[in-house]
């Protein structure tokens, strides 16, 4: 088997506004465009990485928070309606997600070998968080590449930032080893909002910002 590799990583913003601005058919609310600069950045990243023909996208999301261990989406498919709790008028997204369960299980196994607590999410009715959905959608709106969804285990940070960072490094090393063993070509998405400062009001001219 060919050795797998991480072919790229993306600091992948997940505000729901950018999906809203796209007017994608999976999202129910309609917009007059908007947030173009961030969307253009995604378009450039999308073109760059999809040309490399990745086999899988790995999304690590802070909005899937777990207290005991690192959790992984563990069903071949997840379907449902994701509604943003802060901006329900912008994001009501009908998702249909394919998961690379084999790779997810391999990462979980590698993590356990390194002393991490890991768990597979086997509930078919589990509602996938919008951080995972937005970052994966903006990188691949066709949704024709399977994903691996990884939770954000916050409990080590209750002790100290150093302990939390040590856990993240071990998770990253386990992820790398699993990808290499799997033979997959993977793109890593660090789902985030950086400053976490959202627009709280919507301008009447948002759709004409770059006309």
Annotate the PLM regions.
Residues 55-61, 150, 184-192:
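Beta-strand elements within well-structured catalytic alpha/beta cores of enzymes
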Residues 209-211:
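Conserved small/polar residues in nucleotide/adenosyl-binding loops
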Residues 1-3, 44-54, 134-140, 174-183:
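Short amphipathic alpha-helices and their capping/turn segments at secondary-structure boundaries
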Residues 2-110, 114-118:
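A short aromatic-anchored loop/beta-hairpin motif
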Residues 161-207:
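Active-site beta-strand/loop microenvironment that shapes enzyme catalytic pockets
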Residues 18-20, 24, 71-73, 79-80, ...:
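Active-site His/acidic residue clusters
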Residues 95-173:
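Cap/lid and interdomain-hinge subdomains that line or gate substrate/regulatory clefts
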Residues 65-69, 129, 195-200:
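Short catalytic/ligand-binding loop motif for oxyanion handling, primarily in non-cytosolic enzymes
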